[in-house]
From Swiss-Prot:
GO terms for biological process: autophagosome assembly; COPII-coated vesicle budding; cytoplasm to vacuole targeting by the Cvt pathway; early endosome to Golgi transport; endocytic recycling; endoplasmic reticulum to Golgi vesicle-mediated transport; Golgi vesicle budding; Golgi vesicle docking. The small GTPases Rab are key regulators of intracellular membrane trafficking, from the formation of transport vesicles to their fusion with membranes. Rabs cycle between an inactive GDP-bound form and an active GTP-bound form that is able to recruit to membranes different set of downstream effectors directly responsible for vesicle formation, movement, tethering and fusion. YPT1 regulates the trafficking of secretory vesicles from the endoplasmic reticulum (ER) to the Golgi. GO terms for molecular function: GTP binding; GTPase activity; SNARE binding. This is GTP-binding protein YPT1. GTP binds at residues 17-23, 33-40, 66, 121-124, 152-153. A lipid is attached at C23, C123 (S-palmitoyl cysteine). There is a cross-link at K144 (Glycyl lysine isopeptide (Lys-Gly) (interchain with G-Cter in ubiquitin)).
Amino acid sequence: MNSEYDYLFKLLLIGNSGVGKSCLLLRFSDDTYTNDYISTIGVDFKIKTVELDGKTVKLQIWDTAGQERFRTITSSYYRGSHGIIIVYDVTDQESFNGVKMWLQEIDRYATSTVLKLLVGNKCDLKDKRVVEYDVAKEFADANKMPFLETSALDSTNVEDAFLTMARQIKESMSQQNLNETTQKKEDKGNVNLKGQSLTNTGGGCC
């Protein structure tokens, strides 16, 4: 294990173009915000190290372009991702409607064990909101994924979103390791029993 960190998690940010994925990542990684952020072309990424439950977790966060013409480029990044954050804009109904399509993309390209988080960005724009919290929460619950509303502008829940994702992955990995350890012990017990049986059977042979 690397001495600089205990875990390395690969996260993916997906969602329609213009929902604020890059601004969320910039706020989380550098604690800055800009209105002049240029739309991502293809894929960009940043690295952020955080402390989580006494462990050092290195997050490799990939920011993908939402435009259709980049879809084939970004699809390859689904594989190998531990967690995928689907972002929509609370002031843009179409971006929320698009979440279903993004979930289909995850089913198509990601592993079956990948973890998901739904994020409604731009919650600071209260007067322009068109997607209600309860509607999005119900959708997230139906699809068995956590849900948070964020604002890259004023930092609301931005850190919580990434840490929620990281914690999910860490807990999933811990459970997986526990299951594997239990399975190995069971397998070892079976091997010993079989070995003993074979030894006894062959005891009279020269």
